[in-house]
Amino acid sequence: YDPCDYLKAREMQLKRDNPQWRKRPLDDMISMKTGITGQKGRVVYRITPCINDKLDDIAAKTSIRNEQIQLVCNVIDQQIHAAYEIFNRGKEFDDYIESRIAMINIPNKDEAFLREKLYEMYNYPVINHQKAISQNI
């Protein structure tokens, strides 16, 4: 889990409701503290295969430095996303999302919007994982 998920969803609604809204310096401090001390759920560390061959391919493909950097970033992202551990999400995940929405205290709280944004946050890793394993860069 992302301990800052509810803070991110809160910020999304505040920006949606008021495009002029800006975070206060205290908001960043709260996010950092929450990120460091908050519950992260299950964490899996994996070592991915060596990418030296892919780096050689990139060097042969283009000599333009910015293009090389972007291609290297793409390879690294693909390796990370392909190695994701995707956990089953059932009723307890729905309960978790509802508990995160309950933590958001803002005027005109739009629970449907917040719920959608929280689910999107947690679905991106699944989408990225599926894309990475199908690409096989």
Question: What is each of the regions a protein language model found here?
Answer:
Residues Y1-I137:
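Membrane-interfacial terminal anchoring regions of lipid-handling membrane enzymes
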